[in-house]
Swiss-Prot record:
Modified residues (Phosphoserine): S971
Biased composition (Polar residues): 779-792
Protein name: Trafficking protein particle complex II-specific subunit 120 homolog
Keyword presence, Transport: yes
Comp. bias intervals (Low complexity): 972-981
Top-level taxon of the source organism: Eukaryota
Gene name of the encoded protein: TRS120
């Protein structure tokens, strides 16, 4: 059998192409490719070379449309024993190829060519083409005869034209030789034999039969030459005669041959005119051809020679003619019959050729798996031969089956598929189901393993270590679950042995172990966060920070690609990191010599690392690199140097594998089998590289640990900033973010601004003043326990509670000063987030707070004018005399504090003093605006009370607006707005309370460096809630006493020397006095006044027989009316009989009290009298002259 046969093969002239002398392989391929372009020579093109010596036997030669067809057999082939049966099997011409510079002796070339031609006795034309001859060779070439054709050095186009001319000459010579042979065969006849003819002596009957068959065989052979000469009509005429003679003589074998020739003549005659009728005719005739080949089977010589190969060859020719998808069923039946007949073939080479042709035809039909099956049969026949060339052939044939079995090497994939794998398409993040199914089909695993083992075996025999490594890698990577531990170790040894025979640094397209998947592309840390920069805005950082929490809306619709694809910016010269996970699901220790990121761009340098992975385990590693130039970067996978070979592991392949495992398309997930957790699909972001940027690095002076503060503690923290980049910082802005931003009291931003531009390597220190916030009740237990660490406070800040410093900074708009580049490309800015890791421990805790009151009686003295009060220093009047009551009213805020910590606190109370414009400039209060009370010490685990004195504030008037209650919602007055006076009064109350609270500060100190301030606002507010009326609202009536010194000089010097200047009273003298009654309301009050004088024992001194004080005037039953906000006086005189301490008390009963007075007094009945009593006034009576 012959390979690549078709029905038209009978019309093709075979020409042996032989290299003569030494020819470089590349030149030989070039010369051969030049010949292949002239496989068809039109008859019209050879008319100038054709000479008709006598009348041509090809009377129907189609000179206008006919052609001669050639098949160039490089290296020739041995003669076939079936050449007489089919003339196209003969080598009818020989062409020698010579390279003159390599073979300068043309005589030797001619001799070698003649010797080579002796092996082809059937050759009718012989030519030797000598290329690139020298000048001397050109002179000698003319003497060597017409068989040596010299091709002088020239351009390729000229050489091709020269070669075309020579091929036309060869075609004309062959045509003339065909005519000679046909004329001789018709006149003299010829003896034509095949191996089927008996070689034994023939009896007379067989001799007669042979003579009769000779004529029919001659006609068949003439028909073959007519067909080779391009005259299908003449060939068909001779074939018809041969068919008739062969049928009469029972020569079935030659009958089948003649019938085959007639079909070929029919197709050549109707070239390009294929239709259904033609197909039916060919099908019918070839069915007869196959039938007659089968009839020519001779049992006696079946063990030696058999026409079965021609029968199967005819079946293949018909199958090739009908091979298209519409007739697939018929073609498959023909091929199946041919494959079944292969078992009866005697020659193994015929069986090999048959399987090859069957595989080709199945592949042409699109039946790849059937084609792969017969390719494996071919490989088995090759592997039965124990030689290297057969192993190479087996390996090449098996490599053709890998596509059908889905085990193809990545090197054999088309460039288009590779681009689709690694290209950045809009749907590059998606994985399609059909692609996964095509890559992984678990029910074929056993067959895939067998094929890969056969490829591995053939590669080892062929001495191809790279192919052996590739096969072992694919077998181990994709089928490790089905391979025993010993088999896995064997494959690892095969990989190592193949690598030993390969040069160092060899790359293979097929990865082995480990399995590599993308774990994550870490986004920028807070140290290197990049912000887009708008050069048109000075505050380009505005809006760069997140404005609020993420809110999920299930009704929002968006593009999946837009949401899943991330944008990642790297910076030239700054190291970057990518996390990948490696899995070794096999039973041996895996040593990875190096692994690094694979970048399909020239602007990224990756850093290799070596890894050891134990058996059946996975490991997450960090791979790093440095971008080197601006532009996009693609990271499709990793480059791994393992088992002595460098391979590329693509993330997409492992993603498809894991998805296939999830859908049951592959046996096992290598990562799950190694104990790794299930990882969601990680999309590869779009990575771009920005130009060099400044890099600001921050660290807290004294350590980057948590800043431990007690509640209210104030501390200054210094943060050191350094420019670790290669570009200076020319712009910087500091802001705050996060919770508890009030904890940052001040930031010395001017220190940073003054250091700009901050050059590479330069540093600047930024002081930040912090104040610890109040720990909530939910955190009290945690802070209590953390505060117990006295020896070394190692408290941890609660996540999300500490504020952070945001530093937005940027370099110059252009690194090289190019204005065009400045306009087109603006380097981005950066945001540095410095978390202030503040751990607030509970310090002093409030137990309770209450308001205490105390009154100190005032001394009765001369007229108590305002200037007398103002004359006293502020330090002495921290607790002022109430001008409306005439005595000292004190309020104390008592705070009970507990110390649950392990440190000692000292508490100091500071009260802010009021600076009056009337004070003397030399007053010491000017230099000390705060008055400090003595310190209070609170030991650990103890409590203490701190008294904070409060001024007895009073409003100037008692008005009804203080007692106005909110009307019910349904009442008509509920819709009215409060009056302006009511709003004013309430606002005044709130202002006074806030003013009171703001004047008092409670500060603590612990040790040398720890100090702070307690937040007592809530405590004072709580304490004042129930007593706000008592503290702020004045009494309706206030009383006061004073001495009346009629005729006393008003001169200050005289007054200073008077014994009454300090309010002293002498006994046995009449002492004029007056009582002052002030109305603090906005309406007139009628009252009944009474005055009482008591001694130190509390007894009334003006009544009874034992009275010690005589009086003149009225002391009781005094009726008077006091105008609104005015004072009324009542004068009387006292005569003290006994020196000593006396107390004066005034009281009054208000007549016809209104609602405001009753609300202030809190009376329940409208008839109940309202009694007002004033505070006591002391009178110091000294002994006087009798």
């Amino acid at each position: 059998m012959e390979p690549d046969v078709s029905i038209e093969t009978l019309s093709i002239i075979r020409i042996a192409v032989l290299p003569i002398g030494t020819i470089p392989p590349t030149l030989l391929r070039d010369y051969h490719s030049m010949l292949l372009r002239h496989h068809t020579i039109a008859l019209s093109a050879i008319s100038s070379f054709y000479t008709e010596h006598q009348k041509s036997p090809f009377t129907n030669q189609p000179w206008d449309s006919g052609s001669l067809r050639f098949k160039f057999v490089l290296g020739g082939s041995p003669p076939s024993p079936w050449e007489d049966f089919q003339s196209n099997r003969k080598m009818l011409a020989v062409i020698g190829l010579c390279h003159c510079p390599s073979s300068p002796d043309l005589d030797s070339v001619t001799e070698k060519f003649n010797v080579a031609c002796k092996s082809y006795s059937s050759a009718l034309v012989r030519r030797c083409f000598a290329f690139s001859p020298g000048d001397s060779q050109l002179e000698d070439g003319d003497k060597k005869g017409e068989n040596l054709i010299l091709f002088p050095p020239s351009d390729k186009q000229t050489q091709e034209f020269h070669l075309q001319t020579m091929m036309q000459d060869i075609a004309a010579s062959l045509l003339m030789e065909f005519e000679k042979w046909v004329l001789q065969a018709e006149s003299a006849g010829t003896i034509l034999k095949t191996p089927l003819d008996s070689q034994a002596s023939l009896n007379s009957e067989e001799v007669i039969k042979a003579k009769k068959r000779r004529l029919g065989r001659a006609q068949k052979t003439i028909g073959d030459y007519s067909l080779l000469a391009g005259s299908p009509v003449d060939a068909n005429a001779h074939y018809s005669t041969a068919l008739e003679l062969a049928r009469l003589t029972g020569d079935y074998f030659w009958y089948a041959g003649a019938l085959e020739g007639s079909v070929c003549a029919l197709l050549v005659d109707r070239m390009g005119q294929r239709d259904v009728a033609l197909e039916d005719e060919v099908r019918y005739r070839y069915t007869n051809v196959i039938l007659h080949y089968r009839k020519s089977f001779i049992q006696e010589i079946a063990q030696r020679v058999s026409p079965l190969s021609f029968e199967l060859e005819a079946t293949l020719k018909l199958a090739r003619f009908l091979c298209r998808r519409e007739l697939a069923k018929e073609v498959v039946e023909l091929l199946t019959n041919a494959a079944d007949g292969a078992k009866s073939l005697i020659d193994a080479s015929d069986r090999l050729i048959l399987y090859v042709e069957v595989a080709r035809l199945f592949g042409a039909l699109g039946y790849q798996r059937k084609a792969a099956f017969f390719c494996r049969q071919v490989a088995q026949l090759y592997l039965q031969q124990d030689n290297r060339l057969a192993a190479i052939s087996a390996m090449q044939v098996l490599s053709m089956t890998t596509d059908a079995y889905r085990i193809q090497s990545r090197a054999s994939m088309s460039k288009v598929s590779v681009n689709n794998e690694t290209g950045r398409l809009p749907d590059a993040g998606k994985m399609h189901h059909h692609s996964i199914v095509s890559l992984f089909e678990s029910h074929w695993s056993t067959l895939q393993m067998v094929v890969l083992r056969e490829i591995l075996l053939s590669a080892v025999r062929a001495g191809d270590p790279l192919a052996a490594w590739s096969a072992a890698a694919r077998l181990l990577r994709w089928h490790y679950p089905l391979i025993t531990p010993s088999g896995q170790n064997g494959l690892a040894n095969s990989l190592a042995n193949s690598a030993d025979r390969l040069p160092s640094g060899t790359r293979c397209a097929d990865p082995a172990l480990p399995f590599v998947r993308l774990f994550s592309f870490p986004l920028h840390s807070s140290q290197v966060d990049i912000v887009k920069r708008n050069p048109a805005r000075e505050d380009w950082w505005t809006g760069s920070a997140p404005s609020g929490p993420f809110i999920y809306t299930p009704f929002s619709k968006g593009d999946a690609n837009e949401s899943s694809k991330q944008e990642l910016i790297w910076v030239v010269g700054e190291p970057v990191q990518v996390l990948v996970e490696l899995a070794n699901p096999c039973c041996f220790d895996l040593r990875i010599d190096s692994i690094y990121l694979s970048a399909h761009s020239s602007n990224f340098d990756a850093f290799p690392v070596s890894v050891d992975i134990p058996p059946n385990s996975a490991k997450v590693i960090t791979l790093s690199g440095i971008p080197t130039a601006v532009g996009p970067v693609t990271i499709p996978g990793c480059t791994v140097h393992c088992f002595g070979v460098i391979t590329e592991h693509v993330f997409r392949d492992v993603d498809n594998l894991l998805l296939g495992a999830a859908q049951g398309l592959v046996f096992s997930d290598p990562f799950r089998s190694c104990g790794s957790a299930k990882l969601r699909h990680v999309f590869v972001p779009n990575i771009s590289v920005a130009p060099p940027l400044p890099l600001l690095v921050a660290n807290v002076v004294g350590g980057d640990g948590a800043i431990i503060l007690y509640e209210g503690e104030i501390r200054e923290v210094c943060i050191n900033f350094a420019n670790a980049g290669t570009v200076p910082i020319v712009q910087a802005h500091v802001s705050l973010s996060g919770k508890n931003q009030d904890a940052v009291i001040s930031i010395a931003d001017e220190a940073l601004q003054s250091a700009l531009p901050l050059k590479p390597g330069a540093q600047v220190t930024l002081p930040v003043t912090l104040k610890a916030w109040h720990v909530g009740p939910t955190d009290s237990d945690n802070t209590m326990s953390s505060g117990r660490n006295a020896a070394g406070n190692t408290g941890r800040p609660k996540d999300g509670t500490s504020p952070s410093l945001l530093i937005h900074y940027a370099g110059p708009l252009s690194n090289n000063g190019d204005s065009q580049e400045k306009e087109s490309i603006v380097p981005p800015g950066r945001r540095l987030v410095v978390p202030l890791q503040i751990c607030v421990l509970q310090g002093l805790s409030f137990v309770k707070a209450r308001l205490l009151s105390m009154e100190i009686p005032a001394h009765v003295s001369d007229n108590l004018r305002d200037e007398d009060i103002e004359r006293e220093s502020n330090a002495d009047s921290l607790v002022k005399i109430n001008p409306f009551r005439g005595s000292w009213g004190l309020r104390f805020l008592e705070l009970e504090l507990s110390n649950p910590t392990d440190v000692v606190f000292e508490i100091s109370v500071f009260v802010q003093l009021e600076n009056s414009a009337k004070e003397d400039d030399s007053s010491p209060v000017q230099d000390s605006p705060e008055y400090e009370y003595p310190k209070t010490r609170i030991d650990r685990d103890y409590s203490a009370r701190v008294l904070i004195p409060l001024e007895h504030f009073k409003l100037p008037v008692l008005d009804g607006s203080f007692f106005t209650k909110d009307p019910p919602p349904g009442s008509p007055s509920s819709s009215r707005n409060p009056s302006f006076s009511e709003k004013n009064t309430k606002a005044e109350i709130n202002t006074l309370i806030k003013n009171l609270i703001s004047k008092i500060k409670v500060r603590w100190q612990s040790g040398r460096n720890s100090s702070g301030e307690l937040d007592i606002k809530d405590a004072i507010q709580t304490a004042l809630q129930t007593t706000v009326m008592d503290v702020l609202l004045p009494d309706p009536l206030t009383f006061g006493f004073r001495l009346v010194r009629n005729g006393l000089e008003k001169d200050p010097e005289t007054k200073a020397e008077s014994p009454f200047s300090k309010g002293s009273v002498l006994s046995h003298e009449v002492t004029p006095m007056e009582v002052l009654v002030r109305n603090n309301t906005s309406e007139a009050i009628k009252l009944n006044l009474s005055v009482t004088c008591r001694d130190v024992a509390g007894q009334n001194c003006t009544e009874g027989a034992d009275a010690t004080v005589l009086w003149a005037g009225a002391l009781s039953g005094i009726s008077m009316e006091v105008a609104p906000l005015q004072e009324a006086r009542h004068c009387f005189s006292l005569f003290f009989l006994v020196p000593g301490e006396y107390t004066m008390v005034a009281a009054a009963v208000i007549e016809d009290a209104n609602n405001v007075l009753r609300a202030r007094a809190g009376t329940a009945s409208p008839n109940e009298p309202i009694f007002c009593r004033g505070p006591p006034f002391h009178v110091c009576v000294a002994g006087g002259a009798l």
